[in-house]
Design a protein with these regions (language model features):
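Helix-start/capping segments and mature chain N-termini
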Residues: 1-85, 110-295
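Short, acidic/charged, Gly/Pro-enriched secondary-structure junctions
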Residues: 80-107, 124
């Protein structure tokens, strides 16, 4: 389905504390965020006109900025208010919110101590990240040739723009080969995550296994699913998982703000079933974000 390019849309964007016309929300070509990846961001879902886990996302945004040496010009309450304001202004009922923080253009070199910190928040209507028909039968992943960097080489626990370069490379490679997404291994060759989502496996006993987030983000949706599973009596084990262990699992799914709960039917040569446990977790998550009482 064709979508309107993001620089051609209409409405307002919250830009440095002002509601700015969408077409006028611009930055200079020579900004540090573009050239040196001095940029952090968040992705938030809107359900029935409310942002799910807004405060947690804002806390992570501020943590990411601090880790990148960026002093936020606004406090968390102001950013929360900005996120709520922009979805009302844009009349977003079921969509996406993108807060983004970047260094400006005062200095153009590796050093950036004098650069102004800019903040913007945009919102738009947005449906499923993956094709809904594919989600019903499970998406297919390859195994990326790129790996998540060692934790002592990057600020791995941030949502920083530069960390997604290898994700784009991995996803493009996967799509060129007919896959929907790509599984990334960590620096030691263990299962890590997909390009923009965490991963879970289900064994024959109904236990869930998920990698320890020690070189990639411990996703907000990931934590929600762990809580839902445990409250439903499902055992969850966080541990290192070798790729060859995937032959022992019956089910697999991804979690993320964009991905929500997405079943996986294949990773490379490993096959999985879209089992009842995964369907129930997806339903429970849907009920949670929509504030519905589980049946």
């Amino acid at each position: 389905m064709e979508t309107i390019p993001y620089d051609k849309r209409t409405g307002k964007i919250w830009f440095n504390a002002k509601l700015t016309d969408w077409k006028d929300a611009k930055v200079h070509l020579l900004n540090h965020g573009l050239h040196y990846a001095s940029c952090v961001f968040e992705g938030e879902r809107v359900y029935d006109g409310e942002i799910f886990k807004l405060e947690e996302h804002t806390e992570r945004l501020f943590y990411s900025a601090k880790r990148m040496g960026m002093e936020m010009p606004y406090n968390q309450d102001e950013i929360n208010k900005a996120c709520k304001e922009i979805i009302l202004t844009q009349k977003v009922r079921d969509g996406y919110v993108r807060p983004v923080v970047w260094r400006g253009s005062e200095m153009m070199a590796i050093s950036a101590q004098k650069n102004k910190i800019h903040v913007a928040v945009a919102a738009w209507e947005w449906g499923s990240y993956f094709d809904p028909k594919l989600k019903l039968k499970g998406i297919k992943l390859n195994i990326s040739s790129w790996r998540r960097p060692a934790p002592n080489s990057v600020p791995w626990d941030t949502k920083a723009a530069g960390l997604y370069m290898i994700c784009t490379l991995s996803k493009h490679e996967a799509e060129s080969k007919g896959y929907t997404d790509s599984l990334m291994l960590d620096h030691d060759g263990n299962v890590a995550e997909a390009t923009g989502a965490n991963i879970f496996f289900k064994d024959s006993n109904g236990t869930l296994h998920t990698p320890i987030p020690d070189s990639f983000l411990d996703g907000i949706t990931r934590r929600c699913i762990i809580d839902i599973a445990k409250s439903s009596g499902i055992k969850v084990i966080e541990r290192k998982i070798k790729p060859e262990e995937m032959s022992n699992f019956e089910g697999c799914f991804l979690t993320g703000t964009a991905a929500e709960v997405t079943p996986v039917s294949q990773i490379d040569n490993f096959s999985f079933n879209v089992c009842e446990v995964i369907k129930q977790l997806s339903k429970s998550y849907h009920n949670l974000v929509r504030k519905k009482v589980a049946a």
